[in-house]
Amino acid sequence: GLTVGYGEGDVESTTGTKSEENTMFAKYAFDGLGLTVGMQISEKNNDSASDVETTGIGISYQVNDDLAISYGSNTLEKVGSTDQEATAIGVSYTMGSLGIALSMNQVDNIAHSGSNDREGYQLGLSFAF
């Protein structure tokens, strides 16, 4: 089924700066297919600083009762700066009480700096007793 949402608010700091923030999202789970897709768009309008827009997408697929794969992407745009971009790919497998998960994550232009990129890998094991 479809899930949608929207939120907004005003933020005022003790220094007197103000910003307006809003976010909206949509997620759709395809019944019987094991497929879920989602998207989120957020915006922050600052009185005294650059505006920021964020767009994220995600997709997951339950291949069978034991195997799932997922992908996510996020872009953070700041006026007058290099876009920060992040991606992640994940896979998980469960066999009885044993679970294993692997993910690869990459972020480019961290803090909008063109020379600040990172990659990371995670491996997780779980045991249920």
Feature map (PLM): residue ranges:
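Outer-membrane beta-barrel proteins
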Residues: 1-129
